[in-house]
Amino acid sequence: MVAIPDFLPALPEMFLACAAMALLMLGVFRGADSTRLVSWLAVGAALVAGVLVLAASGDRAVTFAGMFIADDFAVFAKVLILTATALTVVLSVNYLEREQMDRFEYPVLMLLATVGMMLMVSANDLISLYVGLELQSLSLYVIAAFRRDYAKSSEAGLKYFLLGSLSSCILLYGASLIYGFSGTTNFERLAVMFSSDVPAATGVVVGLVFVAAGLAFKISAVPFHMWTPDVYEGAPTSVTAFFAVAPKVAALALFVRVLVDPFGELLAQWQQVVWFSAVASMLLGSLAAIQQRNIKRMMAYSSIGHIGYALVGLAAGTEEGVRGVLIYLAIYLAMNVGTFAVILSMRVNGRMVENIDDLSGLSRSHPMMALAMAFFMFSLGGVPPMAGFFGKLYVFMAAIEAQLYVLAVIGVLTSVISLFYYLRIVKVMWFDDLMETIERPARASALVIGGTALFVFPVFYVFSEGILNGAAAAASTLFLR
């Protein structure tokens, strides 16, 4: 029997799940006109859950028969996830109304997906890992196809569902191999088993490769990236904004925990897999984005490249590498949320526009929005003194300390190549002639754009010490054993 105190480490997840169900009931009783109210209450629920998460920081607790762990690593990842959810729901409110998609189920599904993500980063067992992953995925499948009257949205949802189901099968097969050859699915028992002098069975290594492949799909790492451009382009733009941040943060944090915590002693076996995926992701992301004219497809390939940079830190397999990954994720969140806030504001005569050329002359009609977008592009490209430069600096330094010199050099070269398509957007905004005037962004979107733009340049230096210390504390918890 589970004692009452055992539920306390999972209090944020329980609160958010109850809030989602309460908001679902509220939407049912109030009807279709409740979307705005439910959305803002969902933002409030995410913020309260964030406070509950931070209140438990510094403590380490394992509960639910070893299935769930609450530690500083989970706290850091959950704060990022909840921040991403709150910001993307804020951006969605006006978009849903303008696109006639305002249904109260939308923010509820986002909250349920967030609960799944929080369970993922606190998973201490392959079974709880899968449960959290599927809770997230089932919600995301629905919101990817949320715009039922738009063929591309239905196509995006179907593609994501089919390929996501395949990746789940691959992950389950890998988990079954690990259990079959080790006799356990618990992370702590696996870590103890592999810390002995007895070499790991070949079946365990093969199972780990399958699990890594299943998780690589969730983070859009090459060669499991094929769904990303089509889903990013076809899904409603507010959904794409959510996909670009929260699920990526959760899946990559889970990827780090799985490889470093139970399988840290098998670094020699999984390091080469991560090395290849990092190189392939950086190369594909930087080269394929060059020819894109649709800004959402460009951001899809950009996200693939950025996952490659984050994997550089993971490939190091060190505490410094994990710290670099977490710092990178925090900066990546701000850059992408800000960029998609601008994309969501791209309206001409009431209709959404998605081509890069539609930003022509933006500096003349909306100079502050153009300046913010330039900040995001410079930061995504890793140009100093933007925050994105320091994100890449920490992962590359970790790779060099781990003697992965080739990986670091490839990362620097692909980062230089990626500047082409980021600077192209800056050139279009500031030097091309004004074609059509983009409408003024909604107040909520303008606040998000301004806040994230300030974060990626001046404000980052103010909070950098807190982010660095939080990431260091989170990374150290994975190396306690």
Curated annotation (Swiss-Prot):
Example GO molecular function: NADH:ubiquinone reductase (non-electrogenic) activity
Does this entry carry the keyword Transport? Answer: yes
Its Enzyme Commission number(s) read 7.1.1.-
The protein's role, per its UniProt record: NDH-1 shuttles electrons from NADH, via FMN and iron-sulfur (Fe-S) centers, to quinones in the respiratory chain. The immediate electron acceptor for the enzyme in this species is believed to be ubiquinone. Couples the redox reaction to proton translocation (for every two electrons transferred, four hydrogen ions are translocated across the cytoplasmic membrane), and thus conserves the redox energy in a proton gradient.
Q: Where are the transmembrane segments?
A: 9-29, 37-57, 73-93, 104-124, 126-146, 161-181, 204-224, 236-256, 270-290, 298-318, 324-344, 370-390, 404-426, 447-467
Name the species this protein comes from. Answer: Rhodospirillum centenum (strain ATCC 51521 / SW)
Subcellular location per the Swiss-Prot or TrEMBL entry? Cell inner membrane
* InterPro entries per UniProt: NADH-Q_OxRdtase_suN/2, ND/Mrp_TM
Q: Identify this protein by name.
A: NADH-quinone oxidoreductase subunit N
